[in-house]
């Protein structure tokens, strides 16, 4: 969470540098600092993402350019693969922004662009895969049931924000390393 002055601030946070430990991967470090996979890999192009050497200096890109959009509610920057949430502010209180990395649609499953609203929220959701997703999984030898119940194997994770766009939602994941990649349906 960052406080900022909407009249003059377009950037929040600051870059950090840490030292990699023996068992670290860039994916592990990204999750620890609320970053996506591509964010941390792009900030450390000379570092092996799966085997950084112990003692290697790792740049933590926790400085964020705020989107050029109305700063209210949820704003998603697809190019940055990042969600920005601008909560309502009480009079006299500083404006805040909360930001999280996210995965976006694969190239063949383009993420839509435009204005929508959150139609509903659910904790521990079931997932009803679309026929095309079930067909794709069956073709790959991984058939899906008609309904995936809540739990650790549910691709929706533990929370879902259903959007007014049919079949689109902002949701958790059962595969945290996919955060910050083009891997979603």
Placement of each model-derived feature along the sequence:
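Primarily a LysM-type cell-wall glycan-binding module
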Residues: 2-35
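Loop/turn positions that initiate beta-strands
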Residues: 23, 53-58
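Active-site-proximal cofactor/substrate-binding loop regions of enzyme domains
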Residues: 38
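Short acidic beta-strand-loop surface patches of small beta-rich interaction domains
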Residues: 41-49
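Gly/Pro-biased beta-strand-loop elements
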Residues: 67-178
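Short, intrinsically disordered, charge-balanced linker/junction segments flanking boundaries
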Residues: 182-185
């Amino acid at each position: 969470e960052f406080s900022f002055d909407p009249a003059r601030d377009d950037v929040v946070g600051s870059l950090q540098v840490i030292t990699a430990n023996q068992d670290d991967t860039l994916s592990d470090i990204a999750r620890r600092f609320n970053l996506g996979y591509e964010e941390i890999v792009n900030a450390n192009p000379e570092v092996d993402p799966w085997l950084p050497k112990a003692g290697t200096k790792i740049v933590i890109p926790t400085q964020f350019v705020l989107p050029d959009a109305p700063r209210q509610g949820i704003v998603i920057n697809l190019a940055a693969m990042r969600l920005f949430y601008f909560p309502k502010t009480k009079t006299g209180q500083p404006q805040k922004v909360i930001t999280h990395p996210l995965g976006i649609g694969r190239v063949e499953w383009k993420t839509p662009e435009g204005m929508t609203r959150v139609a509903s929220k659910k904790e521990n959701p079931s997932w009803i895969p679309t026929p095309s997703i079930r067909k794709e999984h069956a073709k790959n030898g991984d058939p899906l049931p008609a309904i995936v119940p809540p739990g650790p194997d549910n691709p929706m994770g533990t929370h879902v924000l259903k959007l007014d766009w049919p079949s689109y939602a902002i949701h958790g994941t059962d595969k945290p390393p996919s955060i910050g990649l083009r891997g979603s349906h």
